[in-house]
Amino acid sequence: MTRPSDGGRIEVICGCMYSGKTEELIRRMRQVRIARQSYRIFTPRMDTRYAEGQVASHSGSRLEAITVATMKDILAHAEDAQVVAIDELHLFDDDPAEMVRGCQWLANRGVRVIVAGLDLNYRAEPFPAMMHLLALAEQVDKLYAICVKCGAYATRSQRLIDGKPAPADAPTIVVGGLDMYEARCRTCYEPAV
């Protein structure tokens, strides 16, 4: 973990659906709160699965958060924070380059930036903002789920439509839960066609 005297840094928590990304973000932010560091937690406006103004894991852990749409919104609310946490980075409305620039700007000013999000979309293609932040981050933690088909480590998010893999021409971002996505390993993942 970083100390305030260490200066800014970017930490990325990534993985497929149901790998515990938000749970890990919440765990880190609870430590920040215990350490009495000033912080802000942000969640994207597009994520409507849980109550507005909360970051929530699939297991039920929750923390208060600020719901925003863009990096400009984050920067407007993060002025005095020592730590900025951004959940579901891949769901923000903003241009991916703006998200990356904003995270860099905060870290360059001494802020510890913790982002969590999917590294790959349902087609197993990288989300652009996450791809760049993975390369720029001081710390990267890739988490794994358990494949629903075979029990191996899962690294892919299989989107389902009526119980079948979504086609390649389906929208890249569709917010959903267990009814729409399954965690799958490389072998059990069915590529979108």
Curated annotation (Swiss-Prot):
Q: Which reaction does it catalyse?
A: thymidine + ATP = dTMP + ADP + H(+)
- Listed binding positions for ATP are G15, C16, M17, Y18, S19, G20, K21, T22, D87, E88, L89, H90
Q: Where does Zn(2+) bind?
A: C147, C150, C185, C188
Give its E.C. classification number: 2.7.1.21
Tell me any Pfam family this protein matches. TK
Enzyme group, top EC level?
Answer: transferase
Question: What quaternary arrangement does the UniProt entry report?
Answer: Homotetramer.
Q: In the UniProt entry, which residues are flagged as the active site?
A: E88
Q: Domain of life of the organism in this record?
A: Bacteria
* Keyword field contains Secreted: no
Q: Give its localization.
A: Cytoplasm
Organism expressing this protein natively: Chloroflexus aurantiacus (strain ATCC 29366 / DSM 635 / J-10-fl)
Which keywords does this Swiss-Prot/TrEMBL entry list? ATP-binding, Cytoplasm, DNA synthesis, Kinase, Metal-binding, Nucleotide-binding, Transferase, Zinc
Q: State the similarity comment.
A: Belongs to the thymidine kinase family.
* UniProt GO molecular function: ATP binding; thymidine kinase activity; zinc ion binding
What Gene Ontology cellular-component terms does the record carry? cytosol
Q: What is this protein called?
A: Thymidine kinase
* GO BP annotation list: DNA biosynthetic process; thymidine metabolic process
InterPro entries in the cross-refs: P-loop_NTPase, Thymidine_kinase, Thymidine_kinase_CS
